[in-house]
C-alpha cells in the first residue's frame, strides 16, 4: 500500500453555511484540514442533482456519457419528459472509480455513496447509498457484510417527514454517529481508498434552511429563534464525527472533502417556461385548459396541505394513475400538442430545459427537422432577454456522448431568486406556501473541495474552478494509476505535491454496474426516500 486516501462526502455542503462556522471556530476538523491543505469551490453537474452529480464524480464523465440526468429516467419521447422508472446503479454502464481500482488490485471501501444501489462486486466492500428501498438496513457487497453492520437510520422516510424539526435533527444526529461507528469498523481491514457520503448534511438543508433566513415565508420569528440553530448543529456534528473518524485512521492519510453540489434557500417565486412559450407563440393550450389547470393546481395544493397521505398509500397507486398525476403536475394534458412547437422539461434547480416538438421524434411532433436549429436559436436569443434567466445554451454546450439525445434541446440557468414552475398562464407566480414549508432548501451549482495530506500542496491555488468530474481522474493519478482517455475530468495537478506526469490509458469496457430492473417493492421504497426530500412528488 503506497498511499491511503479518504474521500469524505458531505452531501450538499456549501461554503455559504460553512464559512460562518469556520470563522467562529465551530468546525475545527475542517479548519485544521484547510490550514494543512487548501480550500476550493467545486462546480457540480448540470443539473446539480445528487443522482447525476455522484455518478459524474464516480465516473469522471458528464451526464451525456453516463446517461443519468435525474432520479427518474428522462424519456423525451413522452410529453411528461420522464417515465415512471427510477434511476439506479443499473442505469449507467460506465466504469466507476471503484471498478478501475479493482482492476488495479487496489482495495476500496465505498460507504453510502449515492446511486450505488443495487451494489455490485468490487475488490473491497460496498454499502449502497441513497436512495435504497429501505434506508434503515444495509445493502452490501459482499452480501454477508450487511449482517455485521446493523441498521443505518432508526426511522423510515414517513417517520422522518412527520417528526418535529427537533425530532428530525435528532434522527440526523443519530445517523451521523452510526455512520462513523460503521466506518471505523470497516476501516480496520486493509484498504487503499475509503469513501463515504454523509447524507444528513443534505437532508438538514432541505428541511432547516427556512429557519436560518429572517422573513422566510410562513416561518415566524419565534420558530426561527427556536430552530435557527438546527442546520448549523448538523454541520457541527458532521465535522466532529469526521474528526472522530480521522482519529481512528492513519495520521499520514491523504484526505479529500467534497460535496456534490451546494445549497441555498428555496426561491419564493417561479418562472413558468410553458407560460412564457405560450406568450411567445410557441405553445398552445387546449380550449378551456387554463381554467381547468388552475383548479387542478389548487386541488393538488389543498390536498398536500390537508390530506394525511402517507408513502404507504402513495406507493400503492396504480401505475396508470401515477402517470396521470405526472401529466397533471407538468401540465402536459392541457397542451394542444399539434399546435405546439416547444415545451418545458422540468430538471433540478437552477436548471430548466426546453424540448422542441420535432416531427418523427415526439408523438405529435410538428417542427420539421429543417426548422430545428433556426427555431432553437430563436428561442435561445429571446430567452437571453429575460431578467429571470442567468444563462442559456444548446444542449451540445453542456453535454456530449451517447446519451446526448436524452437531454433537452435547450438548457437554461435561472437567476437565484427564481425556481422553475409549471403554470400555463402567468409567466411569474409565487411558490405555494406549503411547498416552501416542506422543502425550504434547494441545490445550487457550487459545492466544496478541501484537499489535505502528504500528497497535497498546502494552500494550493487553482487557475480554473475545479469540477466534480475532476475528482476521479485526480484520485486515480494520486494512487499511481493511469487516467482513462474517455474521462471528461482532468487531473488537478496544482493540488498535488508530485510532479509525476499523467499517464493516459484505454478505458474499461462499459458493463452495467447492477441490475437495472427493480421489483415493485424496490421501486416503492426508493420512491419514498426520494419523495421525503422533494426529488419526486
Give the residues covered by each predicted segment.
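Low-complexity, glycine/alanine/valine/leucine- and proline-rich hydrophobic stretches
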Residues: 417-472, 477-478
Amino acid at each position: 500500500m503506497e498511499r491511503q486516501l479518504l474521500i469524505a462526502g458531505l452531501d450538499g455542503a456549501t461554503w455559504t453555511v460553512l464559512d460562518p462556522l469556520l470563522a467562529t471556530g465551530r468546525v475545527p476538523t475542517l479548519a485544521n484540514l484547510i490550514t494543512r491543505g487548501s480550500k476550493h469551490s467545486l462546480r457540480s453537474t448540470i443539473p446539480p442533482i445528487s443522482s447525476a452529480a455522484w455518478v459524474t464524480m464516480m465516473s469522471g464523465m458528464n451526464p451525456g456519457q453516463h446517461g443519468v440526468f435525474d432520479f427518474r429516467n428522462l424519456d423525451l419521447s413522452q410529453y411528461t419528459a420522464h417515465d415512471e422508472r427510477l434511476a439506479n446503479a443499473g442505469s449507467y454502464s460506465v466504469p466507476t472509480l471503484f471498478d478501475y481500482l479493482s482492476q488495479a488490485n487496489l482495495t476500496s471501501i465505498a460507504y453510502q455513496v449515492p446511486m450505488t444501489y443495487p451494489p455490485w462486486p468490487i475488490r473491497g466492500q460496498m454499502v449502497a447509498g441513497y436512495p435504497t428501498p429501505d434506508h434503515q438496513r444495509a445493502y452490501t457487497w459482499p452480501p454477508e457484510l450487511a449482517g455485521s453492520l446493523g441498521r443505518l437510520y432508526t426511522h423510515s422516510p414517513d417517520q422522518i417527514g412527520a417528526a418535529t424539526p427537533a425530532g428530525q435533527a435528532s434522527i440526523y444526529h443519530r445517523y451521523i454517529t452510526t455512520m462513523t461507528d460503521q466506518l471505523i469498523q470497516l476501516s480496520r481491514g486493509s484498504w487503499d481508498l475509503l469513501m463515504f457520503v454523509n447524507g444528513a448534511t443534505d437532508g438538514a438543508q432541505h428541511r432547516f434552511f427556512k429557519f436560518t433566513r429572517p422573513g422566510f415565508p410562513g416561518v415566524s420569528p419565534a420558530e426561527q429563534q427556536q430552530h435557527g440553530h438546527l442546520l448549523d448543529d448538523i454541520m457541527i456534528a458532521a465535522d466532529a464525527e469526521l474528526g472522530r473518524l480521522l482519529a481512528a485512521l492513519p495520521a499520514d492519510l491523504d484526505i479529500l472533502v467534497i460535496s456534490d453540489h451546494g445549497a441555498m434557500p428555496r426561491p419564493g417565486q417561479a418562472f413558468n417556461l410553458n407560460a412564457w412559450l405560450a406568450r411567445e407563440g410557441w405553445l398552445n393550450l387546449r380550449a378551456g385548459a387554463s381554467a381547468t389547470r388552475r383548479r387542478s393546481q389548487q386541488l393538488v395544493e389543498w390536498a398536500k396541505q390537508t390530506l394525511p397521505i402517507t408513502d404507504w398509500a402513495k406507493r400503492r397507486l396504480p401505475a396508470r394513475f401515477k402517470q396521470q398525476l405526472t401529466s397533471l403536475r407538468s401540465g402536459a394534458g392541457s397542451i394542444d400538442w399539434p399546435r405546439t412547437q416547444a415545451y418545458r422539461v422540468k430538471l433540478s434547480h437552477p436548471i430548466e430545459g426546453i424540448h422542441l416538438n420535432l416531427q418523427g421524434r415526439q408523438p405529435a411532433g410538428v417542427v420539421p427537422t429543417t426548422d430545428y436549429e433556426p427555431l432553437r436559436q430563436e428561442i435561445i436569443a429571446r430567452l437571453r432577454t429575460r431578467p429571470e434567466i442567468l444563462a442559456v445554451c444548446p444542449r451540445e454546450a453542456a453535454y456530449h456522448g451517447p446519451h446526448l439525445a436524452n437531454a433537452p434541446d435547450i438548457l437554461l440557468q435561472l437567476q437565484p431568486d427564481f425556481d422553475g414552475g409549471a403554470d400555463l398562464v402567468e409567466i411569474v407566480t409565487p411558490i405555494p406556501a406549503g411547498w416552501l414549508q416542506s422543502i425550504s432548501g434547494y441545490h445550487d451549482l457550487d459545492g466544496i473541495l478541501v484537499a489535505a495530506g502528504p500528497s497535497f500542496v498546502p494552500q494550493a491555488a487553482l487557475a480554473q474552478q475545479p469540477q466534480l468530474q475532476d475528482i476521479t481522474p485526480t484520485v486515480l493519478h494520486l494512487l499511481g494509476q493511469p487516467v482513462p482517455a474517455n474521462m471528461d475530468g482532468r487531473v488537478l495537478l496544482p493540488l498535488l505535491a508530485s510532479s509525476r506526469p499523467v499517464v493516459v490509458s484505454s478505458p474499461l469496457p462499459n458493463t452495467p454496474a447492477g441490475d437495472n430492473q427493480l421489483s415493485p417493492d424496490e421501486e416503492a421504497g426508493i420512491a419514498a426516500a426520494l419523495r421525503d426530500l422533494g426529488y419526486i412528488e
